[in-house]
């Protein structure tokens, strides 16, 4: 007795799969009114009957390779196979197989039935024998996975296999007098794996030349900016130190007597000098001031663009509407014009618009006027300075002319920062 191999199938479409299963022994005599196979357990006595799962795989693979895929037109789904009632040929021992489905991995195909065998006339064998143990799990790797130039034909093969699947369940089955296994429930798995594309390029984990050049360029930019930052800090440190020495910066007087160092300025103390910690303390303060200056510039830029919706403390104009109509607030939207609303107990809302530009500056100015009333005296002066722009420009030119030589030794390191600020101001 061979191993039990179970399969489930649609009886109405059984013949569609039959031509690709393998060569089985089929008697020449059939019944007058041929009937289609029904799910169950049958006998077969083919010369190529598989004795185990490996032999069945070999039969399926042989049949798969015998098919002329170039001229294959699909399965004859309207074909019906007759039920055979003849006895086995002489010298051949009848083998009983319980037909069972197992997945066979084909590119684009999954969960297809392994094979079908024609029924034979039952013999008087023992009814109470124990069932044959199940076969071990089948490996998912098959030789036909390495076949080439079959992608187009396998698509038609998958379409033919889809004709075998059905969502209906048939409960009728033929019994087997030689085994105690239950009849097979006719359910077919319709799950098809996605097509496997053959010849796709393998993704390489190595960096491409363009990516390597981009990385090197990025490192160069970072190194350039870091050197400029150090140069700016050194220039500001020199300017800060020069404020304490109007006649010129002398040599460093904080040299350590234990570790003699060469003569140097206080702005370039080596680590062995006592002035080294004071030099880096000054530069740390300089870095904080530069960061504060940058954040202030960014805040002014955002306020000028109107991206900081702040409700004014003393609105120039206001309206009173029903609270149900007052639904827009500074926290709910970022599109101009803005609307600030208050909800009094009477059920009406007092609303006023937020300035489309300099909203934060207006709020800070109003806050300062509320606490320092003398600042209101500066309003006419500021308006006057704004009205005489020519005078202001002349004053600025005179200041640059007077402090020009000193500024020219300080400003060159700041030129990249000024260019960056200009680009941010122009494009934001």
From Swiss-Prot:
Residues anchoring lipid (N-myristoyl glycine): 2
GO cellular component, one term: virion membrane
Glycan-carrying positions: 348
Intravirion compartment residues: 2-283, 233-283, 398-403
The protein, known as: Large envelope protein
Subcellular compartments: Virion membrane
PTM statement from Swiss-Prot or TrEMBL: Isoform M is N-terminally acetylated by host at a ratio of 90%, and N-glycosylated by host at the pre-S2 region. Myristoylated.
UniProt keyword annotations, A-Z: Acetylation, Caveolin-mediated endocytosis of virus by host, Fusion of virus membrane with host endosomal membrane, Fusion of virus membrane with host membrane, Glycoprotein, Host-virus interaction, Lipoprotein, Membrane, Myristate, Transmembrane, Transmembrane helix, Viral attachment to host cell, Viral penetration into host cytoplasm, Virion, Virus endocytosis by host, Virus entry into host cell
Organism: Ground squirrel hepatitis virus (strain 27)
Region (Pre-S1): 2-145
Parts of the chain on the Virion surface side: 2-211, 305-376, 427-428
Chain residue ranges for the region called Pre-S2: 146-204
Family per similarity comment: Belongs to the orthohepadnavirus major surface antigen family.
């Amino acid at each position: 007795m061979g191993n039990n191999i179970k399969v489930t199938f649609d009886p109405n479409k059984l013949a569609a799969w039959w031509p690709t299963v393998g060569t089985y022994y089929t008697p020449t005599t059939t019944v007058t009114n041929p009937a289609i196979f029904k799910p169950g357990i049958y006998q077969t006595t083919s010369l190529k009957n598989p004795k185990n799962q490996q032999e069945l795989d070999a039969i399926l693979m042989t049949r798969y390779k015998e098919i002329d895929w170039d001229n294959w037109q699909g399965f004859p789904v309207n074909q019906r196979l007759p039920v055979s009632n003849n006895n086995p040929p002489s010298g051949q021992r009848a083998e009983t197989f319980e037909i069972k489905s197992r997945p066979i991995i084909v590119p684009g195909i999954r969960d297809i039935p392994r094979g079908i065998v024609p029924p034979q006339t039952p013999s008087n064998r023992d009814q109470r024998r124990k069932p044959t143990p199940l076969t071990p799990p089948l490996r998912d790797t098959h030789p036909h996975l390495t076949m080439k130039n079959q992608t187009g034909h396998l698509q038609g093969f998958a379409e033919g296999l889809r004709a075998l699947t059905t969502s209906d369940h048939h409960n009728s089955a033929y019994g087997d007098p030689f085994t105690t296994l239950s009849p097979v429930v006719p359910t077919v798995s319709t799950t098809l794996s996605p097509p496997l594309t053959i010849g796709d390029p393998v993704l390489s984990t190595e960096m491409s030349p363009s990516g390597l050049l981009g990385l090197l360029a990025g490192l160069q930019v970072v190194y350039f900016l870091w050197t400029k930052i150090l140069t700016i800090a050194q220039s500001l440190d020199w300017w800060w130190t020069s404020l304490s020495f109007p006649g010129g910066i002398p040599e460093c007087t904080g040299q350590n007597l234990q570790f003699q160092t060469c003569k140097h300025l206080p702005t370039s103390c080596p680590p062995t000098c006592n002035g080294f910690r004071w030099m880096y303390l000054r530069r740390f303060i300089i870095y904080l001031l530069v960061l504060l200056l940058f954040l202030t510039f960014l805040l002014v830029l955002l306020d000028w663009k109107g991206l900081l919706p702040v409700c004014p403390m003393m609105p120039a104009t206001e309206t009173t509407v029903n609270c149900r109509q007052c639904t827009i607030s500074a926290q709910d939207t970022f599109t101009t014009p803005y609307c600030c609303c208050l909800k009094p107990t009477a059920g009406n809302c007092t609303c006023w618009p937020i300035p489309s530009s300099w909203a934060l500056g207006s709020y800070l100015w109003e806050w300062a006027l509320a606490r320092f009333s003398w600042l209101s005296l500066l309003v006419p002066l500021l308006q006057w300075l704004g009205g005489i722009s020519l005078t202001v420009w002349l004053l600025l030119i005179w200041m640059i002319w007077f402090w020009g030589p000193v500024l020219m030794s300080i400003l060159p390191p700041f030129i990249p920062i000024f260019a960056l600020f200009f680009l941010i101001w122009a494009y934001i």
